[in-house]
């Protein structure tokens, strides 16, 4: 009577189990990403899809090295699916033909007014920024920025400073019209300053400082989705629009992809910088950087370069 499997058989079975345990979670992740199943805790998790795409390649290599062909087949499908959604962000896209003027736009989350105002003004000066959008904009931040000379560099503005994180602002080198502030009705109730910028030698451009609610907890996911859904769509048959700010979402979140589908282009994605992180890590945490800040431009606008 055989009461135990031979050592070689036990080792083979262990290798098979190991492969399936490694492949299955990434395959489910790929399914959630492709099917747009960003609900509940998956909303936060899917922000890290680029890292999981890298892991999926290692899992495929493991399955092939162990000669586990069925797990390897699933791992290959998973890697192709994830890399197919992520890798194009590192490749520059063909830009539309544009002969108009150059507009340099900068966006910054001021961290409830605690951001480095001096560095921000220096960036505006050094890069000759034409339009600046800010989020988490406070009265103290407004005063400090003006003391540092921002009111001279960008004299036209639509500002809504608030204590805390709900404030918003838009600064411009050129005159602005049709100014206003829109309030997100869910979650934190972040405000979004907007204006139509009169670009010399070009058509006017509607610019808005975007700041939907953050899905920082499960009970905030609904507010996050509602705020993203309420963002102004592109107007491909009308005037040019730009949304710039802290979207609290990555290109792996379906509400942001739906917004892009109205006629926007993600500027970083268009220039091959779509995998550059804009948030994290902070305060010594172990969270790797994710890309939640974006500049979305009308698809008729050519994007020449992006820096983070």
Where in this protein do the model-derived segments appear?
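Soluble catalytic domains of enzymes that build or remodel membrane lipids, polysaccharides, and related
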Residues: 105, 111-125, 134-308
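Residue-level marker of positions within ordered structural domains that often coincide
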Residues: 1-2, 36, 50, 176, ...
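N-terminal, active-site-proximal structural segment of metallo-dependent hydrolase catalytic domains
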Residues: 2-148
């Amino acid at each position: 009577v055989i009461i135990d499997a031979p050592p070689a058989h036990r080792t083979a079975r262990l290798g098979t189990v190991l492969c399936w345990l490694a492949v299955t979670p990434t395959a489910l992740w790929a399914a959630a990403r492709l099917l747009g199943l960003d609900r509940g805790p998956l909303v936060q998790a899917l922000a890290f899809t680029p890292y999981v795409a890298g892991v999926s390649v290692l899992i495929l290599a493991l399955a092939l090295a162990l000669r586990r062909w069925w797990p390897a087949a699933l791992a290959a499908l998973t890697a192709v699916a994830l890399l197919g959604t992520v890798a194009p962000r590192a490749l520059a896209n063909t830009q539309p033909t544009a002969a108009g003027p150059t507009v340099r736009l900068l966006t910054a989350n001021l961290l409830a007014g605690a951001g480095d105002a001096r560095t921000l003004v220096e960036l505006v000066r050094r890069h000759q920024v034409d339009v600046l959008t800010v989020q988490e904009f406070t009265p103290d931040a407004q005063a400090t920025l003006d003391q540092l000379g921002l009111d001279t560099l960008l004299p036209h503005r639509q500002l809504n400073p608030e204590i805390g994180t709900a404030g918003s602002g838009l600064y411009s080198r050129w005159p602005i019209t049709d100014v206003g502030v829109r309030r997100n009705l869910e979650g934190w109730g972040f405000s979004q300053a907007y204006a139509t910028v009169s670009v010399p030698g070009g058509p006017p451009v509607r610019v808005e400082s975007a700041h939907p609610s953050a899905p920082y907890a499960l009970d905030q996911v609904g507010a996050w989705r509602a705020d993203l859904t309420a963002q102004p769509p592109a107007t491909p048959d009308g005037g040019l629009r730009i949304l710039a700010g802290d979207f609290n979402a990555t290109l792996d979140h379906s509400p942001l992809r739906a917004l892009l589908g109205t006629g926007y282009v993600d500027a970083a994605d268009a220039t091959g910088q779509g995998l550059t992180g804009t948030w994290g890590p902070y305060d010594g945490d172990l969270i790797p950087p994710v890309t939640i800040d974006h500049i979305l431009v009308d698809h008729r606008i050519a994007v020449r370069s992006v820096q983070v």
